[in-house]
Amino acid sequence: MTRSRARDTDVCGVTAAIAVIDGKWKTLLLWLLESGPHRPGELRRRAPGLSEKVLTQALREMEADGLVHREAYDELPLKTVYSLTPFGRDLAEALEPLAAWGHRRLERLVEAERQAL
């Protein structure tokens, strides 16, 4: 899905919402930031396989979409902290039923595999 879909007023609401969280890492970043503000290094450590470049790109897109707030502190060493905005918390809350559905689906898959044995 293209980034323009996130701003297209002629698409359904679900499509517009998915466009904002599209990509491999954004839902995980939302989930991590739900627990409170994090520095980029902390986010990378908690997301194995996430490169610095991709993390930076995802956080910039999430900031542009109003989901995260970036706070840069004027101190040495430089310190940057990301946190969810109220809009980002709203999205995280809206994703909870989808997460519950995903867990139920995984349970069904595990049960089906057990029965196949």
Protein language model features and the residues they cover:
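Long, low-complexity, charged/polar intrinsically disordered regions in eukaryotic proteins
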Residues: M1-R3, T9
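Beta-hairpin "wing" of winged helix-turn-helix
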Residues: E63-S83
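N-terminal helix-turn-helix DNA-binding core of bacterial DNA-binding proteins
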Residues: D8-V54, E75-V81, R89
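Amphipathic alpha-helical dimerization/coiled-coil segments
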Residues: D90-L117
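Basic amphipathic alpha-helical segments that dock to polyanions
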Residues: L55, L59-M62
